[in-house]
């Protein structure tokens, strides 16, 4: 039986029972997660200064929330920007949970001048679910200087303003907030003004300029002040504004005359208008307060007012009536000067006029006729004017004579009371266009009376002057790649003639420039003389040319003159640098090798580039843009040499990737880059390229190897065949001319060191003296290359060789005195094959010595292959310059490098490329490793040497020195398989040749 108040349990439908856990439990679970403290819901606050670089760390959100990212799994942590700011200033590193700056934040642009600048973020984590609010406050830095609304303020203050007057000045604005905003103002020192600051509101002040001392415009009409606003940042920033105070004038000064009393004398026959005196008064005020008006004061009598007047503006006192000495001998005139101020002020003076008694009637000159203008080519005695004279006096006072200035090209011819004015000299309108001829008439009275008459005679023009240019020549500089029609220059010619005789037209004289008429390059405006470019100029095609401009007037006949306009095409930076060495093929990096034992400063290679531009546009600068190890390599800025900065160690990698950028000095700058792979090896024999980078497939690799083997075999065969043929030719020449030349070697007596040093210079100079008894293919090379070393070589060339590659070998002889620390440099072999004069950095000297009669040594049949050369069959092996001078006990000698495939030690010599400017990569030399180098005495040769174009090392043997003959070294060729019997036979032949030759000597000076 059921209890009261209870209800039977309702039966639930099965379909409604299933979704209950998801519909009811999920909202409850989310609400519980939001209410519970801990990592599920929290708020983080960070602060970061503005202007931080992208990537700057703000904080680690995962660590602050206690989340382990390794348990969350990928993609379980993300960040939302509340308010969707654009751009996204902050980002979250999903791997470490670090919150970092994504883009540069400018607080002033983001929040303007709000006290707090916040970025609100939301961090969401899944499994377990966590929602965290993140507030990042952007802190202000003092990155803005105070700035006034206007840089200059103009104030106008009357000099009557009393001290204490105030003038409002606009305050400065600073986008920063807090202490970084404007804090103080400073005013430059002034005895008249001071600055008063009144607080207006928070971080805002009212500026007032206060007058503390009265102004006087007459002492200083303009005052310059500097107002400075300083913020409170560390370091403080400031901004300035210029304040110019102009003092306005008030009428506080009276006019004053130069003298209080003026005394003058005046003839009684002075006609009306005669100037009595010119008065001058001054007023230090300005404007209307300083403008003066002259007048006769009330103290002047009416009679004097009838005889004299004064000009109100100029102060000139003139006669207006007839004067008579018998009536009055003197007059007193009172004059006042009044300014035009609001309250006019006046100054006074007195003029005393004394009348001088003279003859009352002066002669009168009457112009009867005037023939003007007169042509400038008028002949002498041409009549210009007809004059007559009259005098009211009688007797001797009536007799009048006329006169002219003696310097005028005119004269007077008189008959009775009439005169004619005629031409007496040459006229030139360009020198004097108008003559104001003053005719003087004098009577015979006592005292004599004189009157003047001025005649204006104009000279008419004839075309007697050609146009004249303002400049002797014009120099026009125009940048290349100009637009057609651009104005080059305006030539101007003047013609001192007038009217049509002075109208000038311009034209170009016909001539050809590079086979084209001048009008194909330049046109001219016939009226203005403006020269225009017809086409675009190219500096690389031609750099300058000239045109001849003719100026011609329109006279009859026309006259003309010419001037030369030189047009110089100015180079533009329109060519990027071109990298000559090292070069890469098939978009692969150039390959260089460095031994692991290389010391600091080791020369890895040298980047050689050129620029087709000129001047500073062709100045090249080398930069290391990218490298695997930033502190292991460096590149010289101007030479392009890549060197090691420290000693290679075991910790160094096996290969390094370098990117060298070459920039020119143009505007804008152009650049080129080259990628270089540097391999670090223990020994030269281990130098192998990274074939995995460049070989695309085994088939391609096998094809390249096959082609390389065929090419090397062909070159070796041709080289050996050439050596044999040349040896036969030299032996034949020896028989024909009696010189010591056999076995591919020519002997010449060695010069003294002083001679070698004296003949070294910076220009290529090949000299073959008359009667030189030496083979023309034996030369000595001295010069300075692009490297920072000095070189000296002797080259033995084969007769008739068509190759542009020289083989240099060392003599071991003393080099002679030279600059301290001089080192060897490699010369481009192309400069030694008939192209002298094209490279100003080398010197070629042909020895002018007697031919040595010593018997040459026999070849040594010892050929050895180098492991590095075997590696060179698979890659491009570049070599480095060598031949460093060393001071030995007997004077300067040279260290002889050797290379042997059987030498495993790191001290063995290494093969490096010659990397100087203009160096042919086929010329190979050697460089010692960092270990103990082989010390060779004077006259010694290395045991082995590399033949260009052949993968072999040639043994160089040296016979013991003999006191009766010169030291000789020979390069011998042969194979290891030759028998000792063959050697003995050759030595026997050599002994027999010594007996025949006698005292012949050989000079071995190749390096």
Curated annotation (Swiss-Prot):
SUPFAM superfamilies according to UniProt: Cadherin-like
Cytoplasmic side: 730-1007
Keywords from the named record: Calcium, Cell adhesion, Cell membrane, Glycoprotein, Membrane, Repeat, Signal, Transmembrane, Transmembrane helix
Organism: Homo sapiens
Signal peptide boundaries: 1-42
PANTHER family named among the record's database cross-references: CADHERIN-87A (PTHR24028), PROTOCADHERIN ALPHA-C2 (PTHR24028:SF119)
Domain Cadherin: 43-148, 149-257, 258-365, 374-469, 470-579, 594-691
GO cellular component terms, semicolon-separated: plasma membrane
Protein name: Protocadherin alpha-C2
Any single biological process term in GO: serotonergic neuron axon guidance
Segments crossing the lipid bilayer: 709-729
Membrane topology: Single-pass type I membrane protein
